[in-house]
Amino acid sequence: MKNTRNEPLRFAVLTDTHVSPARAAVVEQLGRTYAALAEMAPDFVLHCGDITDTGLPREYDLYQQAIPAALRGRIRHVPGNHDVRWDPTAKELYQARLGAARYSFDAAGVHFIGFDPTQPLLEPGHCGRDGLRWLDRDLARLDPGTPVIMYHHFPAGPGHGYIDDQDALLDLLARHGVRALFAGHIHQETVTRLGLLTQVTLTAFADGPSCYWAETDRAADGRPELAVSRLALTADGTRERHLVARVPLSGSSPDSGPRRPRRRARASGWRLRLTGSVQGGIAAAGSTAIAVSTAGQVVALRPEDGEVRWQARLGPAYRRAAFDGAGRTVFVPSADRHVYALDAGTGRIRWRFDAGAPVLSAPLVAAGDRDEHVVFGAGRQLFAVAAGTGRLAWSVPGRGWSAGRACSDGRRVYTCAADGYARAHDLRTGQEAWSYRMVTGDEHRVALYSGWDCVVALGAGTVIVATVCGSQALDAATGAVRWSFPDSAMYPPAVVLGDGTALLTSEQGTVSRVALAGGEVIWQARLGVRLQKAGPVVAGDRAWVVSEAGTLTSVRLADGHLSGSRQLTRARCFCAPAVADGTLIAGDQDGYVHGIRLT
C-alpha cells in the first residue's frame, strides 16, 4: 500500500452486494468483478456494507469464496443493516469473518476511516456518544490539512433520515474538515456537497454489477482532488470509466448557507441520561422502574421523579428486563452472553447464567405450579432457568433465534423464532406440545419474514403471534389457527386487555381493537406516525402510544378516540414504555429516560 504523499492513490469502492444462496448470479458476477479489479491492481478496495443479505454464516462463506487470492487482505469492509439486523451474535459473526467494524488507516498522505453506525436488531443507524467520541479522537490526532475520506453504510444530510443522530455526525465532520464520504443503502448514485464534505452514494452491486474507481489527481489550479468514476466491466473484458465526481481534497468551504437549528423536545416531567441508547424497554414493578442501555448501564428509578435508587454496569442490553412475581428480583438480558439476576432493592448480583451466545431476547418470568422460571432465547436455543437460583431447568437446542419474548399460561410457554415457527413447550420440562409454521421458503426468506422479533401475547386461550407480513391467533391448546389479521403486530407488540379483546398495532401506525374469540374489529384508529418496538402501554381507560419519531398519543379504549398528542423527545424511540405510579416512562436513542405524569 502506498504511504507517501507523492504517489497517486488508486482504489475501488462498491456496496450492497447482498450475497445469499438465492442470488447465485450475483455471487458469480461478484467473483468476476473482484478478479477484474485484481488485474487493475488497486491499492485497496472499500466495501460500504450490506455485504450479505441476512448475515447468515452461509452468506459469509459465499462472499469470501468470491474473493480472489490477489485481493485477500486488501478489501476494507464496514457492515450494513442487512449484515447485523438479523444476526443473533450481535456482530460477533461479522467481526470474526471480516474484522473490526470501525477503524482507520493512512495511505499516500490520505487518512481513511471505516465507520459503523449500524445497530443490532434495527434498520436505522445510530452513532451514539461512544461512536462520535471515537471518531472525534481519531480525527483530532491528524496533522492539520490531512485529507480525510470516510466510508460507512448510511448516507447523511438533507433528505436522509437513516442515522438517528446525523446532525451531530455532520457537525463533527465539518469541524474536522472531512473531505469525502462514501455510502450505500439507498441503491442510488448521488453526489451531494455539504460544505467541505462531498458525499457520494453508490448504486447497489446486487441490482446490476457496479463498482467505482477513485484516483487522486490534480485540479486545474494544481490543488489535490479525488476523481471518482463508475466502472463498467463488460463481457469482453473492456473497462469503461464514467466520471461521477471530483472531490476537492484541500481548499476552503463554499458557503452552504445557515445551518438548520437543532430541535429540542418540549420540557415536561423528568428525564435522565444513560450511557448508550435506551431501546430495550422499561420494566416496572410497584414503585420501581428499571431502564437498561446498549452500553450496559442498568438503573433503578423512582417513577414519580426519576430519582436513581441504584445503578449497575453489565454487558450491552438490547431488550427489556423483567421482574419476578414478588418484585424482589430483576432479570437483565445481555449481549455479553449472560442473563443476570439482580436484587431489585440494591442492584446486587444474585446469580448470572452463561447462555453461550448473546442474549438478545427479552426474558419472561413464568410462574408454574411450584416455581418460577426465567425463559429466554440465546443463539438458536431456548432456555428455562430457575428464577431463584439460576440453575438450568431445561433447554431446547437447534431452533431459530429470537429477539422477542415468550408468554406463558403457567402450563406452557409460547414462542416465535427466526426459523419460521411458533411453538408451545411444557413449562416444566420444555417438551414441545405443538408447532405452527408461520413462514415458508428458503432460509433467507424465512429469516427476513419470520416472527424473529415477536412479543407473543396470550388471552382467553388464544395465542397472538406475528410475522413481518401479518398476525395470527392460534388456539393455545392445539396451535390451530383461529383467525388471521392483515396488519403485523410484531414490531409494536400486541396487548391483551383482559376483557376478551386485544390491541393490535401496526408498524404503519394503525391501532385496532379486536375480539380474541374471532378477530372481529371493534374499532381502528390511525395515528399517522410510524411505530417500531415502542408501541402502546395501557393505563386505566387509555392506551398511550410512543412512536418512532418520539410522539406520545392517547387512545381511548372505549372507541379509539385520539387525544393528548405531545412530543416526548426528538430522538428516535424503539423502547417499549411502562406505566408505574401514574407516570409513563420511556427511553430514546440518545440515551434519555423520560418520565411523564399521566394523572
Predicted regions span which residues?
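Blade-level signature of beta-propeller repeat domains, shared across WD40, Kelch, NHL, RCC1
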Residues: 568-599
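Metal-dependent catalytic neighborhoods of phosphoester/phosphodiester hydrolases
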Residues: 24, 49-68, 85-96, 125, ...
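Extracytoplasmic beta-rich repeat domains
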Residues: 263-283, 310-324, 351-367, 379, ...
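Short loop/turn segments that connect beta-strands within beta-propeller blades
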Residues: 302-305, 343-346, 386-389, 426-430, ...
